[in-house]
Amino acid sequence: MRRVILALLTIAVCWFASYAAHAAEFNLPKQVTAGKEFSVTTSGSGDGVLVLIGPRAISRHKVKLGDAISISDEDVRAAGRYIAVLRAGGESNSKTFFVAAGKPGKLTFLARPSRVPAGKQDVISGVAFVFDQYDNLVLAPSEVKFDLSVGGKQSASRAVTTKNGIAWTRMNSGSTQGAAQFVASLPGAEDEEATVRRVVQQVAAEACNLRMKAQRTERAIVVETEPVKDCSGNSLPDGTIVTFTEVDSAGRSTVDARIKRDIARAELPLSDNAAISVASGVVLGNELHMGSGK
């Protein structure tokens, strides 16, 4: 009789364990938003432990089977793939779910180069990476606004839709030299990091309409440029090299002069018949012919 009772008890225990193992079921959303609370429903009875394994951390929750489990925002701030494991009655049950980035809240902005000539097309590049408030890259399309201004006057503006969290653009430099403010921003976002400013120094481009005049003195031919400016009217910086070249029967003479207050001056050897030219970089200016009577 004892053996019969023992056998029945063993069967009952095994049946109960099997029931408990099957009863320890749970359900959760397939996808949630980073930093948002949500609930996990369970079935069965007894105690158990729910473990969440995420990209940045692991959290552990004691549960009463049959009750809902509240998952706090702190447990799901990192976007990515999560594994939820429910341990109860000596058995484990696992499921996966995904945490998606929240709405755009901040961005990282890179601008290149730091120095560009004024009045040039597509010389300034900007790339922005969009993140939510928990530093997750926002893969969903969002809008980034790029603005370029010099001296408080806006010279260019455009909106770019991100692709895989990245927005990229090229901008024309402004027509005037100075410190250009290159700004990337997230429309509607209030975080301080939703607007990032970079400074791009715009300098005068190459010389334009380079012209000179020449005058004979007792000891030399004195050459002098008109004010040297680029095609947008910006003065070339002091120190820019201007090259004067004299060609006559004796050969070639070359003098490099630095611009000072918009003008470059130099002295060339006296000659009875010379051709004098001027250049700055790859830009050629006018040519003069000096004879003995001039």
Language-model features, listed with the residues they occupy:
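The feature marks long extracellular or luminal low-complexity segments
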Residues: R2-I5, S18-K294
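Bacterial N-terminal signal peptides
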Residues: A7-F16
